[in-house]
């Protein structure tokens, strides 16, 4: 069952002659983990903005096509209404945090929706425990670490109970520990909470391991789509457009060029076994 349907969507910002999105068609299944990759400026972030109605309602430009979210056409419904269907998390958590405490930050959106007090507290407690910030609920958000800030930004979206969580490079400004915390949370939300995940991420190693499907953007178009192991077999093409390859794909590709394997995308165990075999053969 599809939770999002994107139908022939094109978009051009008001101050630009060029289209940032060109004839995008995509169906996203309920519960799916979709990874989005592509070079800078390829349209990934713009695409994310179409999924919760910021485009066309809040961002000026020329918009064509339709985005259907859980049966609602984004043209016909407000951003506030769509926010209960699709939650959006940006690169920089500081741009989304502006309250005095962690608790107030998470409560803010619910107060604006007029949620009953008992239900509001149930959601706040659930979200903060899920992102492991309940014990820091009285903290001043700027005092949190980078990973904690991003987890707080995610919690402030989760309390809306969206069916889909869209994350636009949420780890790009984090240190290794912060990245690990946020990516671990994203896995949990998909596997345990059954939330549909749409993740724009340069960490292709993570996407190869955990995404159900990957979409590749270039110059405003979808140029590749499929299972991670199928997408990453297109090594030369991905290198040509500037996509970072997963580590074991780079290793597998070099082994393939040497005639040691038939495909570039290998499991971790396969990489170890082939390297071990090549090493032993070299010693004999």
UniProtKB/Swiss-Prot annotation:
Q: Name all ABC transporter domain ranges.
A: 4-244
E.C. number, please?
Answer: 7.-.-.-
* InterPro entries recorded: AAA+_ATPase, ABC_transporter-like_ATP-bd, ABC_transporter-like_CS, ABC_transpr_CbiO/EcfA_su, ECF_ABC_transporter_ATP-bd, P-loop_NTPase
Q: What class of enzyme is it?
A: translocase
Compartment list? Cell membrane
The record describes its membrane topology as: Peripheral membrane protein
The job of this chain, per UniProt, is described as: Probably part of an ABC transporter complex. Responsible for energy coupling to the transport system.
PANTHER family associated with the record: ENERGY-COUPLING FACTOR TRANSPORTER ATP-BINDING PROTEIN ECFA1, HEAVY METAL TRANSPORTER
User: Could you tell me what this protein is called?
Assistant: Putative ABC transporter ATP-binding protein PH1815
Q: What is the lineage of its organism?
A: Archaea, Methanobacteriati, Methanobacteriota, Thermococci, Thermococcales
